[in-house]
């Protein structure tokens, strides 16, 4: 299989392209907006739902709940990914966005621990688990839907998944900066943190409406590669592809969650004001939004792996010095520089990755294969990233522990990207 081997058939018209991009991206954007907002307001949520008398323990419990929701992702990947391979991409996309909306509503309106006791953290955990199940099938189904609309421009079309995450990162950062700057700590704790979740709920009906009026992906409809057991076929016949796919997702996951964790790191470890950390994070989101379609389009011409290999190598070389620089000279400009570098490297890697995943798996098992590969990596290296980093810093007393986690992920993804190029002959 080669990355420049496309299915027969012409690419779709511009109106169809716009509908496909918007419908796929809006659900992905909602998913990531909720994830990013939860992480961005972790310090506030910890005090409202996990009061222990120890801020570090409360924060650990908040991130643990965040991580537990990711255990639902592989289950969602299996159920919704296989559903998309049997019933179609459109049906799976409809189901995933409706489930995401339910989970978001539960978090947005959940009373605090002071109001209903243990039901409050239990309700937050349940809402996050529903979101995790939904997110487990969202990426694979929506990315498959995009690439199957334009087999000759997979890189460009699938990169809009990443651009939509850039919008989510930008919006989450702006909400964080504005709310922290305009509200008192008491107002933020009482009701301010709920505002972005309610905003996310306002987006959901538009996404549901758009997806309901979609046509099925042309390549999926025309394909003769159909299977009644996509999960079995993926595990039996595509184990190496699944392993390489999961490995290739690691650096993308670590990059996003690194950018997400930095506001907490800046406030808790460096003592910087919350608004400055969110303002710096918005730069990474802006770079991701603007740069992703450019990288995706270039990957259609020169291949996916050159971007991914280069980005992984630069992460390995630059991460430790960047955090030494920030830790020794904490300040807004230093934080801004760090987020800018992360934004560039994250975009280089992440924007090329969805098309590579689509190249790895055939049409018949693409929804299942992509969902599993993506969510195995995201569960391990994303869901527990904040928990692992917070614990490492508390356990070792070394503020640079975050850089070791990033470098480890970069090494694994470099190996996976090289394997995709050398073993699977993908470019």
Kindly give the residue locations of the regions a language model identified.
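Extracytoplasmic gate region of multi-pass secondary transporters
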Residues: 39, 239-288, 382-386
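Cytoplasmic membrane-interface "Motif A"-like loop-to-helix N-cap segments
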Residues: 86-97, 301-312
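Hydrophobic core of transmembrane alpha-helices in multi-pass small-molecule transporters
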Residues: 116-136, 332-348
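Glycine-rich segments within core transmembrane alpha-helices of 12-TM secondary carriers
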Residues: 134, 156-177, 374-385
């Amino acid at each position: 299989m080669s990355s420049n081997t496309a299915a027969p058939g012409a690419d779709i018209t511009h109106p169809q392209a716009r509908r496909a991009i918007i419908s796929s991206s809006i659900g992905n954007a909602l998913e990531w907006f909720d994830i990013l907002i939860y992480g961005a307001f972790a310090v506030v949520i910890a005090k409202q739902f996990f009061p222990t008398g120890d801020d570090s323990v409360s924060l650990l419990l908040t991130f643990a709940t965040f991580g537990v929701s990711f255990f639902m992702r592989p289950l969602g990947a299996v159920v919704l990914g296989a559903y998309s391979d049997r019933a179609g991409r459109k049906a799976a996309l409809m189901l995933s966005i409706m489930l995401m909306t339910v989970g978001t509503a539960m978090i947005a309106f959940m009373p605090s621990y002071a109001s209903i006791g243990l039901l409050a953290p239990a309700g937050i955990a349940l809402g996050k688990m529903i979101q995790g199940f939904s997110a487990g099938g969202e990426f694979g189904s929506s990315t498959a839907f995009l690439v199957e609309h334009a087999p000759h421009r997979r890189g460009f079309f699938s990169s809009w998944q990443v651009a939509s995450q850039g919008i989510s990162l930008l919006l989450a950062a702006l909400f964080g900066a504005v709310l922290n700057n305009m509200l008192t700590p008491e107002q933020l704790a009482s009701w301010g943190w709920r505002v972005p979740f309610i905003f996310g709920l306002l987006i959901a009906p538009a996404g549901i409406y758009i997806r309901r009026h979609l046509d099925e992906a042309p390549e999926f409809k025309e394909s003769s590669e159909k299977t009644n057991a996509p999960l079995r076929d993926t595990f039996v016949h595509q184990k190496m592809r699944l392993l390489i796919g999961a490995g290739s997702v690691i650096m993308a996951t670590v990059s996003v969650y690194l950018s997400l964790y930095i506001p907490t790191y800046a406030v808790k470890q460096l003592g910087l004001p919350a608004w400055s950390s969110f303002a710096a994070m918005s730069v990474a989101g802006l770079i991701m939004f603007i740069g992703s379609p450019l990288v995706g389009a270039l990957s259609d011409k020169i291949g996916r792996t050159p971007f991914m290999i280069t980005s992984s190598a630069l992460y390995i070389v630059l991460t430790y010095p960047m955090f030494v620089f920030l830790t020794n000279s904490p300040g807004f400009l230093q934080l801004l520089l760090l987020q800018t570098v992360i934004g560039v490297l994250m975009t280089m890697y992440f924007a090329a990755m969805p098309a590579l995943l689509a190249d790895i798996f055939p049409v018949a098992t693409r929804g299942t294969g992509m969902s599993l590969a993506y969510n195995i990596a995201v569960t391990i290296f994303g869901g527990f990233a904040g928990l692992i980093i917070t614990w490492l810093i508390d356990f070792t007393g070394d503020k640079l522990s975050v850089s070791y986690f990033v470098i480890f992920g970069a090494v694994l993804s470099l190996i996976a990207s090289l394997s995709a190029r050398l073993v699977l002959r993908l470019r």
